[in-house]
Amino acid sequence: MEMLETMETDNSMSIRELNEKMSNDPDLSAVNLDVLTSNGFEPFVLEFPNAEKRSVWEATFKDAKITLAKHLTAAPSWSLKTIIAHQTRPGLQLCTATVVPGKRVDSTPFLWVCASDKFSGQVAVMALDSGEITIETCSAIGNAAVTAMCTVPPPTRPRKRKIKSQKSLEQLQKESIMDINSSGSDTESSSDEGTSTAGQTTVWIGNDDGEVFVVNSTERIRSRTRDRLARLRNSVTSMCAANGNVLVATSYSNQVQLLLFRPASDGGWDLENPQTVGHVCQAPITNMQQIGKRVIIASGNSLHAFFMDTGKFQPPVEILPSSDVITLMNVTGQYVFLSGRKSTEIYVVDVFELSVLNHFNVTSFVRSQLSGREHILREHKMGCLRVSCLTVARHHLWIGTSAGFVLSTSIQAAKSNPTPDLRGLRSRNVKLINEMVSVCEIGHSGPCRILLPVQTPTHSNNPSRKQKRSSLNVPTQQSSQLMLVSCGEGLDDGTATQDPSTDAINHLIFWKFS
């Protein structure tokens, strides 16, 4: 009996010593994580008081990770909001679009859509109110094809104030009050004049003649297009707002130029003296997008990374075959999605290493969608099939095709699966009375040329009096709703009821996510 008690005591002492050793062991009470930042993956260490708390946290973290992965791969639910028929002059094709924020933070944004041919451009401004979406204005701009457009936030300018230490607190308070009042009057006067870009969001529109129009987001395009204009030597191929500046790429023959426009001293933009950025791009720059401190640049079949803070380039990497050119690109998080000219292949690239992670083809899905159509229509659409636009929304990659179909797949599947599960964009209307689901597929009869996600604010219908008076309860009064805009030629609902005469009319389909 004494021997058993001695053994039990020794075992309990051993367990206690082992627990103390595990609690004091830094390897068992710490978790090493790789955190994704704007500069890539960086190590991060979490330390816990003991190994037990570390194991509990690790189990909870793994469960949350599995739940998040299931949420990211699940197909988002959406419904058809409205369809806008954008009647333009014959020959004009939709070429680019951008989302422009409203006058206030909680205001509804606007959608600027450009249509163009070889000799002219046209800009339509659409109001995205909570009710009906309407076309506010439609104006001509320039005498050449519109090639690029981007929304540029107002330039930031640090205010320099020299304060002498001998001044009293009352004097400093009076000066600060005067500064606030004077700055407010300046803002009001500038907004009233409408001829200055100081402190206002602007829309930059470039065309084939090398003209860059800088238009205030709150003014009429027709009356102000010639007030702020930069004339460049070569055709504009791409534009991008990055780190308070604007990058504009131009090209002619084998001359490729990258220009950097900076804010002016008056709070506007210096359009007369752009800075030339040295680069190694051998082909025209077709796309530029900012991610963190870098700008990803597509030139020819290669990707370049330009660091805005240092002005240096990462060595370029060839992504496509030498005979192909990158024409479509979308950058989000850790991944770059791109496609070549007249190609049905989509490549997934790591944004930091610029290495190809995966690539897949959309031909088989489009062929299955066209299986019930007429033979001549099926042969025509399959013969000229290509990926026409790309965007990312709700953790999914959205793909527009020349056949008019809009496809989607989760980013998780796109980055690793050579044959990801592609779905068609559709409107689902649930009939609760009959307990049935009716599905109506809608696309374009011609190419889908633009896909653009739009975030619109939604306000609380019945906020309490306390919420109304509190300035810290903005999230309780305001939330956002995501819409996906599909812009293309004609309308196709999967039946033979549509009028063929509307196939040449540009249509915008607004899908609302729930």
Where are these regions (language model features)?
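Blade-level signature of beta-propeller repeat domains, shared across WD40, Kelch, NHL, RCC1
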Residues: 403-406, 410-412, 447-463, 477-514
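Beta-strand-rich domains and repeat architectures in extracellular enzymes and scaffolds
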Residues: 86-122, 144-148, 184-204, 208-209, ...
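Canonical pleckstrin homology
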Residues: 1-72, 200-202, 301
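Structural core positions within WD40/WD-like beta-propeller blades
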Residues: 112, 204, 247-249, 296, ...
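Structural signature of WD-repeat beta-propellers
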Residues: 115-118, 207-208, 250-253, 298-301, ...
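Long intrinsically disordered, low-complexity regions that are acidic and Ser/Thr-rich
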Residues: 1-24, 163-192, 401-404
